[in-house]
């Protein structure tokens, strides 16, 4: 959830996209429609935000962010968080996965 929030906030703070801090509501879903393990995050994001002067500004575009830009930012942050968690021991590698395989998945 942190990777999603930080990605949205950092990109939308850029005047090229919004230049403001948006409102964000996020929900973590851990299952898919077929009741299989499928963790994913849904985010509702306001179509505007609060600028540095404290004013609400509307989005300049029909979409807040280009898909590729958000995808790259989120993937980079998520892989970084996962790498740090594995390195620190906060996230344990599954027994049948080697450290090399885990590392290759995160790069």
What are these regions (language model features)?
Residues 1-107:
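Beta->alpha loop/short-helix hinge microenvironment recognizer with preference
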């Amino acid at each position: 959830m942190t990777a999603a929030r930080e990605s949205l906030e950092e990109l939308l703070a850029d005047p090229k996209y919004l230049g403001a801090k948006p409102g964000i509501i996020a929900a973590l879903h851990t299952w898919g429609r077929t009741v299989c393990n499928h963790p994913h995050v849904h985010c509702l994001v306001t179509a505007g935000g609060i600028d540095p002067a404290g004013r609400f500004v509307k989005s300049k575009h029909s979409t807040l962010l280009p898909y590729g830009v958000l995808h790259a930012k989120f993937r980079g942050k998520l892989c970084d968080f996962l790498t740090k968690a594995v390195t620190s021991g906060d996230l344990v590698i599954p027994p049948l996965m080697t450290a090399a395989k885990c590392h290759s998945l995160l790069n």
